[in-house]
């Protein structure tokens, strides 16, 4: 499946939970195990919660076995802090947004 999902998250008390659940669904869709998907969702939810004021926009591009997520919002300090915190998910700060990539963990033969 290929597609794009966009969320516009206004400054409300529930936006971190909305972001968390959206990331969990996307991660499971591309084949991540549920525990890993929950870990990714929780981390992104925390990042969205820490983003003060304004609107946060999340855009996810699904490409079969991976999903690329761009989070727009926050300032340079927020992006720098959360790029480090989301490093396990390949987070990068670029062009005014924070991007990360979620992929299925490849299985290895024993």
Positions of PLM-derived features:
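Conserved beta-strand-loop-beta-strand hairpin that lines the nucleotide-binding pocket
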Residues: 1-5, 48-110
């Amino acid at each position: 499946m290929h597609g794009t999902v966009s969320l516009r998250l206004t400054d409300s008390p529930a936006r971190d939970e909305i972001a968390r659940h959206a990331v969990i669904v996307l991660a499971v869709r591309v084949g991540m195990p549920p525990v890993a998907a929950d870990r990714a969702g929780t981390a992104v939810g925390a990042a969205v919660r820490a983003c003060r004021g304004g609107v946060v926009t999340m855009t996810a591009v699904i490409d079969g076995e991976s999903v690329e997520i761009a989070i727009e919002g926050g300032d340079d300090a927020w992006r720098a802090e959360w790029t480090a915190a989301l490093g396990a998910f390949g987070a990068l700060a670029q062009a005014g947004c924070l991007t990360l990539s979620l992929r299925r963990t490849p299985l290895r033969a024993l």
